[in-house]
Amino acid sequence: MKIIPFSKLTSIINKGDVIALAALSTANLPAEILKTLVEYNDEDQSFTDFTFMLANDISDYRGDSYDLDAFTTRGMIKRLITSIITASPATINAMRNNEIEAYYLPQGVITTHYRSKTQESPGTISKIGLNTNVDPRYTGGKVNERTTEDLVSLIEINHQTYLQYDFPDIDIALLRGTYADMDGNIYMTHEAHLGEGYSLALATHNNRGKVIVQVKAVVQNGNFNPNDVFIPGKLVDYVVVNTNPKLHRQVMQTQYDPALSGHYQITEMREPYIELGTRKVILRRAAQFLLEGDVISIGFGINNELSNVLSEEQVNHLVQPNIDTGVFGGLISSREHFGMNYNLSARMRHDMTWDFIYNNGLDVAYLSFAEVDQMGNVNVSKFGEKMNGCGGFIDISQTVKTIVFSGAMVVGGQLSYENNKVTVEAQGRATKFVDKVGSMDFNAENAIKFNQEVYFVTERAVFELTHKGLKLIEIAPGLDLEQDILANMAFRPILSDDIKLTQSDIYQAHWGGLAQAIKSDYRI
């Protein structure tokens, strides 16, 4: 391991390199390394044709940092392989305009494939992604017309069908830790999550690439417990020491919060409780599907505020909420800090989290939907002007026992919640229950085949997936079935013989009924 100044990086990284990072937004983001590369390119425009490989988007949501958009707008990226983009609008535009090659592939597959690289395996072979948009019988994960090379192929082993993911070898791993010792061992002491940096370092080292780690400081050997080593020094080629704290923030809005790295626990949520409205009503109804002891996965979108509802109802101790980034239990942060937990009970490597998920570790997954069709197929990745990608949606939805899809039934609708009922003030645009989904991210036929329980919770009605398609099983009190629900769908769902009314107490400002629901013997 060599400790080098940032200026030396430009002699190590070359035009056309395959560069991989293990960051989530600004967490674990080696921003000062990225700044160095961007500024060097600004001088002579020689740092181009990079392939970037990321499990998550890297952005601080402000548009003025050294992140994915900074590289895209300068024409530095030739190809992007990722699972999700939520806050890099310039990169989305570049993909839409065919300015770069791009792939959206399952986050768990991207994260765990680094181990395949270390084992000299013929790519990653998995059933994850079969019969979805990443299957080559659909798009193979290709985002636009400029993207032509197949990274995913269909193969058969012992009369069973699999997908084979063939990722490029990694030339450069750009990682971040809190400290390095004189032997190059990396410690994640102040980081909010561990990420997949260890596996990425292994894969890069195996390819004779270079592993570069940005840290806050280099310390003498023996300062830390050897059990706390995250990346052994033998895997690290270069260490650079941060000179500007703003380019080494723990998370987006916080330089360093010890509670986010598990060093102490907070007494209550640091985010205000959600006001009574459509989001809160949906989340309350969705939470009623929980049972005591459930291990749950909370996805991006509306569900990232589910932990807020659990906390307000004082039921956090009855279930274990998890995020697929590797943080288990506790209070899940929402919005810009989504992916970080307060009061976490365990912290695992990102790739190990997918081992847990793939091996039936979850009981219930709370996922969002953008479009759903009559058969119950779901699109989350590409709709309207949005093309955010699948994230871990495909990995989770193909492995969990029970799925609760949550979302508003219409776009722009206005509802009021008074006297324990719902009143529609404005219907909104019916764009979510469609004839055909724009991207096959969840294949309902697969779910039926593997006996998954699947529900769709909206502010107006609740649906259940059956082998014949979507069945309406519940409507909100005060609504007209034809005018307020069916008129906002492009198809007519199966109607239950016993359509129930949603429990009216969830429309009160203060509820207090979730604990009783969770302690019941069945999902309601």
Q: Where are the predicted features?
A:
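Conserved phosphate- and dinucleotide-binding cores of soluble alpha/beta proteins
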Residues: 2-11, 25-43, 53-70, 76-267, ...
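Short helix-capping segments at alpha-helix termini
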Residues: 41-46, 313-315
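Glycine-rich phosphate-binding "P-loop"
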Residues: 263-278
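Long, compositionally biased
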Residues: 512-524
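Glycine-rich beta-strand-to-loop/alpha-helix junction loops that act as flexible
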Residues: 20-25, 29, 54-56, 299-302, ...
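Active-site pocket-lining segments that scaffold enzyme catalytic pockets across diverse folds
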Residues: 282-308
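Anionic-ligand anchoring segments at beta-strand to alpha-helix junctions in alpha/beta enzyme folds, i.e.
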Residues: 127-128, 297, 305-344
